[in-house]
Amino acid sequence: MSAPHETMSFQAEVKQLLHLMIHSLYSNKEIFLRELVSNASDATDKLRFEAIANPSLLENDADLAIRIEADTAARTLKITDNGIGMSRDEAIRNLGTIARSGTKEFFQQLSGDQQKDAALIGQFGVGFYSAFIVADKVTVETRRAGVAADEAVRWESTGDGEFTVDAITRAERGTTITLHMREGEDDFLSAWRLKSIIQKYSDHISLPIRMPKEVWDADTSAYKRTDEWESVNQASALWTRPKSDITDEQYIAFYQHIAHDNEAPLSWTHNRVEGRSEYTQLLYIPARAPFDLWDRNHKHGLKLYVKRVFIMDDAEQLLPSYLRWVKGVIDSADLPLNVSRELLQESRDVKAIREGSTKRVLSMLESLADSEEEAERAKYTTFWQQFGQALKEGLGEDNANQERIAKLLRFASTQNDNAEQSVSLAAYVGRMKEGQDKIYYVTADTWAAAKNSPHLEVFRKKGIEVLLLTDRVDEWMLSFLREFDGKELVSVARGDLDLGSLADEAEKAEQEKAETEWKDVVARAKTVLEGKAKDVRVTLRLTASASCLVSDEGDMSGYLQRLLKQAGQKAPDAQPILELNPEHALVKKLRDLPEGDGFNDRLLVLFDQALLAEGGMLDDPAAYVQRVNKLLA
């Protein structure tokens, strides 16, 4: 006879489960205090809600607060709140059942606006057990608000899978958690250490966290505890206040606090977003780039709070990488965290915050860049000098905002006689010559190299503006920025450069004539430069230089090849095209030279000079010097 169908429960070894949670769930020991303070904060919020319907629960003690007290002699740490407290059944149910959250259960009983107003933090029901990270025994004494003093309860456990519960008498409502510290954890009994943890994680929860006040004792040259209590947290989150109540000085002071920066920020935006994802954002644009802006191993991101409790310092998921320089705070009512609340999990809510924050930052930048006030535009100039190269990364990272980012770009240009990157693409388009349908640019290692590039000669002759691109990221950026306002971006170093209607018929006829006249010389030159140049031809794009190198359509530019090699990356060895200026004296002499060393040496010098002019490196500098010396002799 077959066995009957049964539904059975998984069995868990509670002792092993506790050990796993205590030693594996949290990566940072100090997290225990954040979790216990969060629980205490939840308890006071529960009391506030229940007291709305039943004011007697306050028991003439409406001063809600959390008290933290360390006893170095007894090696204990006490966390006390005068919140809702727990009955015997609640203590057994909430503390004796792992992953059961009383806060979550309470929250589910609220409805409508009550839920929106609730600042309850607990989510998983495991935060309490973080106490065992630093304590080998935990004692909880608690009395629920509204019940008699003799109905209080003591819950105690050593974290071995068992706990005891006793009835006690407790005059005050609320809960006291006493941690009996493990050996080697006395650091968490230091008042200075406790204050620093509180200010890091719980500075902005809505109620005061108090500790015994200490004063300096000159006789003992040490701090001495007094009977007074003092608040050690701000108990107020700036970002939760209405913007109209916050002064510029307060915004600046808060930025300097969270960013550890002595300078004032360039700009900030403060918004509360409501809808499917509810969160508050306070974002700043710094005035100076951090020293580690380009360190990919260093984490960059916003400070993340959930209901005003600090969760993490560098929440990289809340902004794209190209905005990693933004400082600020995101405070969400509900975000998917892992069980230890140390890692943010990707979700639609996280994506919505990232997209919303990105749009806010770009709007800030647009406001500065397009402002009618010179002082605001000057701020954008400062921003661009500090963070412009990082913003360029956005063209490849953020397809949805590509057009907005392109409008914010700034470049040096032949329009100005300096290296300042101040020309926008819109300004360039607005100055284009009649008949011009392309945006022209040149890339080089330095502004001087770009400004003096032989490729610009024909453009100067015709009065056509060319953008001078000298940032290492520019070549990569251009692979994503193919056009702007319907105008194609074209490198002046491309061999198939077509000026369209900007080239008159006489010039085209002259080019065809030169190609015919120099046909034999070009053929000889191709033979000499086989393996070094993909092609040789004459050009009228040069007016002062004898030669230049250009890239064939579809080939990687020489500048980009050099960048990749410098970065240790493999780069295709695309050979350049040598273009000769038939009107230059050095080139004219080629036509008069017979085949042989004289012709070869002069041609190779012209090739090497063109390579040097565009910032390239010679394969054999010594041979180049010898050839030049021959010509000079």
From Swiss-Prot:
GO CC terms in record: cytoplasm
InterPro entries assigned to the protein according to its UniProt record, in alphabetical order: HATPase_C_sf, Heat_shock_protein_90_CS, HSP90_C, Hsp90_fam, Hsp90_N, Ribosomal_Su5_D2-typ_SF
Region (A): 1-341
Keywords recorded for this protein, A-Z: ATP-binding, Chaperone, Cytoplasm, Nucleotide-binding, Stress response
Keyword flag rRNA processing: no
Spans annotated as B: 342-562
Residues making up the signal peptide according to the UniProt record: none
Record region (C): 563-633
SUPFAM superfamilies: ATPase domain of HSP90 chaperone/DNA topoisomerase II/histidine kinase, HSP90 C-terminal domain, Ribosomal protein S5 domain 2-like
Principal location: cytoplasm
Subcellular location field: Cytoplasm
Entry keyword annotation includes Repeat: no
Top-level division of the source organism's lineage: Bacteria
Cited Pfam families: HATPase_c_3, HSP90
GO molecular function annotation: ATP binding; ATP hydrolysis activity; ATP-dependent protein folding chaperone; unfolded protein binding
SMART domains named among the record's database cross-references: HATPase_c (SM00387)
UniProt family annotation: Belongs to the heat shock protein 90 family.
Binding partners and assembly: Homodimer.
Protein function: Molecular chaperone. Has ATPase activity.
Protein name, entry field: Chaperone protein HtpG
Gene designation: htpG
